[in-house]
């Protein structure tokens, strides 16, 4: 896939002197791309001259998200990794090594000083390519970040030769990992919900003193959340609860009696997508959401109490992601099969009409949330890159 490779900022084959070159391997899903972009932003703050290259594939969200954030993207052949042993494992080696060769070309092209991997099918070839070949290719230092409570295949492989391993939670399955949380973009970590609350509620049409429930299921929404919450609309209105519901661009929300901000009843504001999550978080008192690693990280970072509804697929990672917050008292977990309109009405009304309990959950969520994870990952990578033997030899000349 070398025909997809574009010239990196700074030019090909130029002596960049002390400017560090960092490659971020975190393509595929938003759960891999967003932490990578948060770290990219932190790198740019800590080291303004840093050269950042994101590694991805043509199939992932990175083709849209990375350029939108102003970073350079290089593409390799995707190698989807099976969650469990299967016939796909037999075909994995030749497919992986093709991607490894392409990744080596990218690492050479940008003269990489360090690779930061976030797991997934882009990270595995990056880890393998960075190992080097004695006498033929220099080794490139690797920093791993694991966002999920249960480490995936790529990061388990990368662990064997990684220079530094960081994780979102304890007991991720990566030996020796330092717990730093999930890297979250600065627009969220710097959010002061109370300071922005009046503006946020006016933006969505809620009263200043409203009790607001936020509902979202990720970028594509979640059908089970949509059905359960929309069916509880009448009961929520009777309890004085306003709702901000992002149902997903591909979904249609069916409300028996839609309520808008210009009506007397508490409004039920339904939108396909929220492009200002900072305002959504600031407007809300409580959230119902999935518990992907990125979602839990953002919700806890801003100190929002949550009813987490783990996606009922995979190996149970989403439930594990939510447990640290839940165990601290900042939220609760409800199984997808148990999320009924009656449960929504009962739990939401109970929480939003009990200010002391809600305040305690808010404080607990904020206590668990990590606001400096992106800076910690970025600093770890910069420190290791500067200490690398190949980097020390390169100062003043080409490697």
From Swiss-Prot:
Q: Glycoprotein among the record's keywords?
A: no
- Catalyses which reaction(s): di-trans,octa-cis-undecaprenyl diphospho-N-acetyl-alpha-D-muramoyl-L-alanyl-D-glutamyl-meso-2,6-diaminopimeloyl-D-alanyl-D-alanine + UDP-N-acetyl-alpha-D-glucosamine = di-trans,octa-cis-undecaprenyl diphospho-[N-acetyl-alpha-D-glucosaminyl-(1->4)]-N-acetyl-alpha-D-muramoyl-L-alanyl-D-glutamyl-meso-2,6-diaminopimeloyl-D-alanyl-D-alanine + UDP + H(+)
Amino-acid positions noted as binding UDP-N-acetyl-alpha-D-glucosamine in the UniProt annotation, renumbered to this chain: 29-31, 148, 185, 219, 318
GO molecular function list: UDP-N-acetyl-D-glucosamine:N-acetylmuramoyl-L-alanyl-D-glutamyl-meso-2,6-diaminopimelyl-D-alanyl-D-alanine-diphosphoundecaprenol 4-beta-N-acetylglucosaminlytransferase activity; undecaprenyldiphospho-muramoylpentapeptide beta-N-acetylglucosaminyltransferase activity
Q: Which InterPro entries match?
A: GlcNAc_MurG, Glyco_trans_28_C, GlycoTrans_28_N
What EC number is given for this enzyme? 2.4.1.227
Q: In which pathway does it act?
A: Cell wall biogenesis; peptidoglycan biosynthesis
> SUPFAM superfamilies per the record?
UDP-Glycosyltransferase/glycogen phosphorylase
Tell me, in one coarse class, where this protein mainly resides: membrane
Going by the UniProt record, its keywords in alphabetical order are: Cell cycle, Cell division, Cell membrane, Cell shape, Cell wall biogenesis/degradation, Glycosyltransferase, Membrane, Peptidoglycan synthesis, Transferase
Topology relative to the membrane: Peripheral membrane protein
Annotated GO CC locations:
plasma membrane
Q: Out of the domains of life, which is the source?
A: Bacteria
Q: Where in the cell is it found?
A: Cell membrane
One Gene Ontology BP term is: carbohydrate metabolic process
Q: Its biological function?
A: Cell wall formation. Catalyzes the transfer of a GlcNAc subunit on undecaprenyl-pyrophosphoryl-MurNAc-pentapeptide (lipid intermediate I) to form undecaprenyl-pyrophosphoryl-MurNAc-(pentapeptide)GlcNAc (lipid intermediate II).
Q: Family, per the entry? A: Belongs to the glycosyltransferase 28 family. MurG subfamily.
Name under which the protein is recorded: UDP-N-acetylglucosamine--N-acetylmuramyl-(pentapeptide) pyrophosphoryl-undecaprenol N-acetylglucosamine transferase
Query: Gene name on record?
Result: murG
């Amino acid at each position: 896939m070398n025909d997809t490779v574009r010239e990196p900022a700074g030019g090909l084959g130029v002596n960049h002197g002390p400017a560090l070159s960092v490659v971020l391997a975190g393509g595929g899903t938003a759960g891999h791309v967003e932490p990578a972009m948060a770290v990219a932003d932190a790198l740019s703050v800590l080291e303004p001259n840093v050269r950042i290259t994101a590694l991805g594939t043509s199939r992932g969200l990175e083709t849209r998200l990375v350029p939108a954030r102003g970073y350079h993207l290089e593409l390799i052949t995707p190698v989807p990794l099976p969650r469990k042993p299967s016939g796909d494992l037999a075909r994995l080696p030749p497919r992986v090594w093709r991607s490894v060769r392409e990744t080596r070309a990218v690492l050479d092209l940008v003269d990489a000083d360090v690779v930061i991997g976030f797991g997934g099918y882009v990270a595995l070839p990056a880890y393998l390519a960075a190992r080097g070949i004695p006498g033929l290719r220099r080794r490139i230092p690797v920093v791993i970040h694991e966002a999920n409570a249960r480490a995936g295949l790529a990061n388990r492989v990368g662990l064997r030769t990684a220079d530094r391993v960081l994780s979102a939670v304890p007991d991720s399955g990566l030996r020796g990992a330092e717990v730093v949380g999930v890297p979250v973009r600065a627009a969220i970590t710097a959010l002061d919900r109370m300071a922005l609350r009046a503006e946020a509620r006016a933006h969505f049409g809620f009263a200043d003193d409203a009790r607001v429930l936020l509902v979202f299921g990720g970028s594509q929404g979640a059908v089970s959340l949509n059905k359960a919450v929309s069916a509880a609309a009448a009961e929520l209105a009777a309890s004085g609860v306003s709702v901000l519901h992002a149902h997903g661009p591909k979904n249609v929300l069916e409300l028996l009696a839609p309520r808008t901000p210009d009506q007397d009843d508490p409004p039920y504001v339904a939108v396909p997508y929220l492009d200002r999550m900072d305002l959504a978080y600031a407007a809300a008192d409580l959230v119902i959401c999935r518990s992907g690693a990125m979602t839990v990280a953002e919700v806890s970072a801003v100190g929002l109490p949550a009813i987490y509804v783990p996606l009922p697929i995979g190996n149970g990672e989403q439930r594990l992601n939510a447990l640290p917050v839940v165990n601290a008292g900042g939220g609760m977990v409800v199984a997808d099969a148990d999320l009924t309109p009656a449960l929504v009405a009962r739990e939401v009304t109970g929480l939003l009409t009990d200010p002391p309990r809600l305040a305690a959950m808010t404080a607990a969520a904020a206590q668990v949330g990590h606001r400096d994870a992106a800076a910690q990952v970025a600093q770890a990578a910069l420190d290791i890159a500067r200490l690398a033997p190949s980097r020390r030899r390169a100062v003043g000349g080409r490697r």
